[in-house]
UniProtKB/Swiss-Prot annotation:
GO terms for molecular function: metal ion binding; metal ion transmembrane transporter activity; symporter activity. It is found in: Cell inner membrane. It comes from Pseudomonas aeruginosa (strain ATCC 15692 / DSM 22644 / CIP 104116 / JCM 14847 / LMG 12228 / 1C / PRS 101 / PAO1). It comes from the Bacteria. H(+)-stimulated, divalent metal cation uptake system. The keyword Metal-binding does not apply. This is Divalent metal cation transporter MntH 1.
Length: 439
């Protein structure tokens, strides 16, 4: 049979192709409804445990032990709040954040938001490229440069899934998350951290953030956890569920979507905390406080833990994390293009464009700075994401707090106050970092 590349946008990666594609029967039991609503949160959670998170958490754990563990927890709770606003916005209005921004802002402002959203997607994909390339390097022995080139072939995965239903995509993502989680569970069992010290790291210590280096890492953790493109992504994919347009159905959908978000991001929190705990217990505790590269962590795990299993699981989990953007990056790219520009292109082309734009800085960085600088490039990509975050947060909080737009589903005042406080905190941290850099 002759095969030809698709010339139109195709499911399951394009929002217009999968909107209202998962039916939720009104007479279904609460557990059945919850099971049907689980999925969008999983797609979002993948971005919360990507290689960028690994780089920041490994450096934070090796340099400062468990001291920045509370930042991981606070960043994850912040993500739960913001992603819940996204699902509320999408369900209440029937439109995603990109569509609403196009409708409610002047064309020049909306176009600027689109460019920033695209930049955040490329920055995210840069982290995935570097992470997957590192995994190929560690597991197969190829050079990191060769690994970067190999990541270009993930477009074939998008082609293989063309026409698949959305639940199949969510099942694949769940498999990736389960793989990552299982690997780190075994890692922690092998290492055996001292849990009272871990618990002490959960207590906020603002003095820790008073100097530039821990603040830089804290902002990197925040940028690696709460990603701008996830805000656009979540407000769109939550609309794949069909539960009715009446107020009662929307209220139920918001409640179940909130549970999906909290549950999925709790899994991501456990993975991110496990990475930092792993680095703190294995490296900081043994005096290796300068482990800032993922490949260094991989090679050190073997002699420190006393077996090849720990390092193999580490590399395998990294590969699973690196491949995750094949799905979420493609969907997010289509969301912002359809929402801001009303443009549709074949999903394999969208994937090729995003990956191509990420490959260029990845190759330049590796060839110019050397393969040993991959970890620094990963952390930098996460800081860039944090600097862009306020530009996506502003419209999200503003729209979800607008009673004229949201009706009875408008944010409670305390939620809006908390969200705006978070916006101010992130902006202040970013400005402080810029002052350290250029002041």
């Amino acid at each position: 049979m002759k095969y030809s590349l698709p010339t139109t946008a195709t499911a399951p990666f394009c929002p217009s192709a999968v909107s209202h594609s998962v039916a939720v029967p009104a007479d279904a039991s609460p557990l059945r409804k919850l099971a049907l609503f689980v999925g969008p949160g999983l797609l979002v959670s993948v971005g919360y445990m990507d290689p960028g998170n690994w780089a920041t958490a490994i450096e934070a754990g090796s340099r400062f032990g468990y001291a920045l563990l509370f930042v991981v927890v606070l960043a994850s709770f912040s993500g739960m709040l913001l992603q819940s606003l996204c699902s509320r916005l999408g369900i209440a209005t029937g439109r995603d954040l990109a569509q609403l921004s196009r409708e409610r802002y002047r064309p020049g402002v909306a176009r600027g938001q689109w460019l920033l959203a695209e930049l955040s997607i490329v920055a995210t994909d840069l982290a995935e490229v570097l992470g997957a390339a590192l995994a190929f390097h560690l597991l197969l022995g190829v050079s990191i440069t060769t690994g970067v080139v190999l990541t270009a072939f993930d477009t074939l995965i998008v082609l293989a899934l063309q026409g698949a239903n959305f639940r199949r995509l969510e099942a694949i993502v769940l498999g990736l998350i389960a793989t990552i989680g299982a690997c780190f569970f075994v890692e922690l069992v092998l290492i055996g951290p001292y849990w009272p010290d871990v618990a002490a790291g959960l207590r906020p210590s603002w003095d820790t953030l008073s100097s530039q280096e821990p603040l830089y890492l804290a902002i990197g953790i925040l940028g690696a956890t709460v990603m701008p493109h996830n805000l656009y992504l979540h407000s769109s994919v939550v609309q794949t569920r069909v539960s009715g347009d009446d107020a009662a159905s929307k209220r139920s959908a918001i409640r179940f979507s909130r549970l999906d978000t909290i549950g999925s991001l709790s899994l991501a929190l456990l993975v991110n905390a496990a990475i930092l705990i792993l680095a703190a217990a294995a490296f900081h505790g043994s005096g290796h406080t300068e482990v800032v590269e993922i490949q260094d962590a991989y090679h050190l795990l073997d002699p420190l833990v006393g077996g090849a299993l720990a390092s193999f699981l580490f590399g395998f989990a990294l590969l699973a994390a690196g491949q995750s953007s094949t799905f979420t990056g493609t969907i997010a790219g289509q969301v912002v293009m359809e929402g801001f520009l009303r443009a549709k292109i074949p999903c394999w082309q969208r994937r090729l464009i995003t990956r191509g734009l990420a490959l260029v800085p990845a190759l330049i960085g590796v060839l110019w700075l050397g393969e040993a600088a991959v970890g620094k490039l990963l952390v930098l990509s996460q800081v860039v994401l944090s600097l862009q975050l306020p530009f996506a947060l502003w419209p999200l909080i503003r729209f979800s707090s607008d009673r004229g737009l949201m009706g009875e589903f408008v944010n409670p005042r305390w939620v809006s106050a908390l969200a705006w406080s978070l916006f101010g905190l992130i902006s202040a941290a970013n400005l402080t970092l810029l002052y350290f850099w250029f002041g």
